């Protein structure tokens, strides 16, 4: 099967496959503050990912590209919304365009629409330094995502089976490209062990891509004749993954993604240690079903709601939101305790 056809199948299955709701955000409860001592007009949403300054912690995470007209139109619509709302955007894997010049336009449209926006290029862990540079140049990217998707590849009928040398390639890319590198998972979460190894080779930004959002094991299983059921619920829930990375490697910048559906989810992700939050599935569904205007309205509502939540917590900035007290309970508390983390760090600060 061609990469272009596979991209279309991924979009179709992503739209028809519901998020599994296992992100762990329901286990997080904020400690209410009756004297927040803030003026709502003083609250702002600016944040930073390393050297990149963002006007909002929300960004459109990697989804698609390389599937002809349909993915061209999706990326065009996403870019229009990102431009209007002044938020960053990542494109989907550019491997298809690196192999087939005819697919370049499905990615280049993002920069054409949003000439001054912050845009992230995207490659797989099998990519070379040359691939990385070409992907960045293709869309004049401000940052580069390298996605880790071992489980997806294992379930994918035509997926890769050689995962050696990945860390070395990442190290070489980090040293060679002139933009910040973000290493991300695609729905299975990042462990403290993985975060430490990535930090050792110079990675400074990690997108945990946790369990709870778009499930690529389920998507790939829909393309199989013999289903591999044991990978359908595989992974680290997003809430736990954020803590694993943030608490193990405090110098790393963390992005929370995977099952972020609401401003409350986003606030919880930030309070656990994320500096930004990526959203994909809910935004894709809104765009495809209702159009660009509805997507813009949805993003603006997220901004409005996050501001209200920050007001209730007395947090004027994203930095202050990262330090508000919260209580972790349920499965997330159990996971973190078993993994050696003290959740009182969050409840008593």
From Swiss-Prot:
<keyword id="KW-0288">FMN</keyword>
<comment type="subunit">
    <text>Homooctamer. Dimer of tetramers.</text>
</comment>
<dbReference type="GO" id="GO:0004452">
    <property type="term" value="F:isopentenyl-diphosphate delta-isomerase activity"/>
</dbReference>
<dbReference type="GO" id="GO:0000287">
    <property type="term" value="F:magnesium ion binding"/>
</dbReference>
<dbReference type="Pfam" id="PF01070">
    <property type="entry name" value="FMN_dh"/>
</dbReference>
<feature type="binding site">
    <location>
        <position position="214"/>
    </location>
    <ligand>
        <name>FMN</name>
    </ligand>
</feature>
<feature type="binding site">
    <location>
        <begin position="62"/>
        <end position="64"/>
    </location>
    <ligand>
        <name>FMN</name>
    </ligand>
</feature>
<dbReference type="GO" id="GO:0016491">
    <property type="term" value="F:oxidoreductase activity"/>
</dbReference>
<feature type="binding site">
    <location>
        <position position="93"/>
    </location>
    <ligand>
        <name>FMN</name>
    </ligand>
</feature>
<feature type="binding site">
    <location>
        <begin position="6"/>
        <end position="7"/>
    </location>
    <ligand>
        <name>substrate</name>
    </ligand>
</feature>
<dbReference type="InterPro" id="IPR011179">
    <property type="entry name" value="IPdP_isomerase"/>
</dbReference>
<keyword id="KW-0285">Flavoprotein</keyword>
<dbReference type="GO" id="GO:0010181">
    <property type="term" value="F:FMN binding"/>
</dbReference>
<dbReference type="InterPro" id="IPR000262">
    <property type="entry name" value="FMN-dep_DH"/>
</dbReference>
<comment type="function">
    <text>Involved in the biosynthesis of isoprenoids. Catalyzes the 1,3-allylic rearrangement of the homoallylic substrate isopentenyl (IPP) to its allylic isomer, dimethylallyl diphosphate (DMAPP).</text>
</comment>
<keyword id="KW-0460">Magnesium</keyword>
<keyword id="KW-0963">Cytoplasm</keyword>
<keyword id="KW-0479">Metal-binding</keyword>
<keyword id="KW-0521">NADP</keyword>
<dbReference type="GO" id="GO:0008299">
    <property type="term" value="P:isoprenoid biosynthetic process"/>
</dbReference>
<dbReference type="GO" id="GO:0070402">
    <property type="term" value="F:NADPH binding"/>
</dbReference>
<feature type="binding site">
    <location>
        <begin position="280"/>
        <end position="281"/>
    </location>
    <ligand>
        <name>FMN</name>
    </ligand>
</feature>
<feature type="binding site">
    <location>
        <begin position="259"/>
        <end position="261"/>
    </location>
    <ligand>
        <name>FMN</name>
    </ligand>
</feature>
<feature type="binding site">
    <location>
        <position position="184"/>
    </location>
    <ligand>
        <name>FMN</name>
    </ligand>
</feature>
<feature type="binding site">
    <location>
        <position position="152"/>
    </location>
    <ligand>
        <name>substrate</name>
    </ligand>
</feature>
<feature type="binding site">
    <location>
        <position position="153"/>
    </location>
    <ligand>
        <name>Mg(2+)</name>
    </ligand>
</feature>
<dbReference type="GO" id="GO:0005737">
    <property type="term" value="C:cytoplasm"/>
</dbReference>
<feature type="binding site">
    <location>
        <position position="122"/>
    </location>
    <ligand>
        <name>FMN</name>
    </ligand>
</feature>
<keyword id="KW-0414">Isoprene biosynthesis</keyword>
<comment type="similarity">
    <text>Belongs to the IPP isomerase type 2 family.</text>
</comment>
<dbReference type="InterPro" id="IPR013785">
    <property type="entry name" value="Aldolase_TIM"/>
</dbReference>
<protein>
    <recommendedName>
        <fullName>Isopentenyl-diphosphate delta-isomerase</fullName>
        <ecNumber>5.3.3.2</ecNumber>
    </recommendedName>
</protein>
<keyword id="KW-0413">Isomerase</keyword>
């Amino acid at each position: 099967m061609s990469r272009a056809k596979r991209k279309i199948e991924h979009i179709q299955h992503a739209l028809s496959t519901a998020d599994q709701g296992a992100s762990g955000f329901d286990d997080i409860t904020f400690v209410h503050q009756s004297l927040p001592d803030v003026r709502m007009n003083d609250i702002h949403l600016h944040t930073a990912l390393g050297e990149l300054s963002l006007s909002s912690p929300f960004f459109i995470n990697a989804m698609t590209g390389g599937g002809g007209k349909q993915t061209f139109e999706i990326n065009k619509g996403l870019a229009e919304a990102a431009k209007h709302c002044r938020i960053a955007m990542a494109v989907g894997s550019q491997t298809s365009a690196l192999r087939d010049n005819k697919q370049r336009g499905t990615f280049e449209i993002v920069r054409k629409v949003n000439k001054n926006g912050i845009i992230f290029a995207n490659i797989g862990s099998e990519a070379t330094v040359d691939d990385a540079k070409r992907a960045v140049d293709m869309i004049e990217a401000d940052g580069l995502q390298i996605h880790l998707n071992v489980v997806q590849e294992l379930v994918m009928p035509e997926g890769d089976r050689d995962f050696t040398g990945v860390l070395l390639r990442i190290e070489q890319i980090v040293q060679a490209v002139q933009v910040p590198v973000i290493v991300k998972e695609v729905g299975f979460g990042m462990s403290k062990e993985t975060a430490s190894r990535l930090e050792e080779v110079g990675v400074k930004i990690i997108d945990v891509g946790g369990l709870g959002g778009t499930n690529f094991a389920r998507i790939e299983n829909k393309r199989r004749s013999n289903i591999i059921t044991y990978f359908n619920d595989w992974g680290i829930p997003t809430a736990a993954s954020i803590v694993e990375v943030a608490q193990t490697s405090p110098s790393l910048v963390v992005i929370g993604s995977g099952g972020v559906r609401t401003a409350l989810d986003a606030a919880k992700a930030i309070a656990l240690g994320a500096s930004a939050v990526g959203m994909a599935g809910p935004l894709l569904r809104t765009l495809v079903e209702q159009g660009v205007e509805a997507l813009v309205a949805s993003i603006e509502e997220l901004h409005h709601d996050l501001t209200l939540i920050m007001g209730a917590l007395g947090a004027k900035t994203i930095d202050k939101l990262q330090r508000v007290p919260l209580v972790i309970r349920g499965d997330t508390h159990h996971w973190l305790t078993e993994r050696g983390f003290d959740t009182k760090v969050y409840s008593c600060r």
